[in-house]
Amino acid sequence: MTQATSIQIHATCVAIDGAGILLRGPSGAGKSDLALRLVDAGAALVADDRVDLLRRGACLVASAPAPLRGLVEARGVGILRLPFLDAAELHLVVDLVARDEVERLPGPEAEAMLGVALPRLRLHGFDASAPAKLALALRHGVAIPAASGRSAA
């Protein structure tokens, strides 16, 4: 049986210095809000609400579906058109959770999508420090559990 090489998911994606960050969570978790704060701090929008993921070798590449390119929801303001990147290689998956679900000192976690393992963090999307935490996580590297490796078959 052949494994899929592409999927579309409900998420948001931004890139810091070209490194893609996939923001996941239920509606209202703060995906678009956090993306706007990251863009305001210098990140680039890749996709909001729906993200196309494509496996390219041992990497996952994120992009926006054509009708949504450059669009982001600013709750209370409306749909905004912003500059965007056509695509970004994913380096980090972030699950946005309730504040009481965020561990103070989490161990390494990974998420496998389309057979590619990526480091995963759980953050509260509305914390003021969330953009800084993500920038620092990329800069200093987030570990993938040793058993996961970069590519999961």
Where are these regions (language model features)?
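Conserved nucleotide-sensing/catalytic segment adjacent to the nucleotide-binding pocket
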Residues: 40-98
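Conserved NTP phosphate-binding and transfer environment spanning the P-loop NTPase/kinase superfamily
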Residues: 87-153
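Short beta-strand scaffold segments in enzyme catalytic cores
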Residues: 12-14, 52
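N-terminal pre-Walker A segment at the start of P-loop NTPase domains
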Residues: 1-8
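Glycine-rich phosphate-binding P-loop
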Residues: 14-39
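A short, compositionally biased
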Residues: 8-10, 47-48, 105
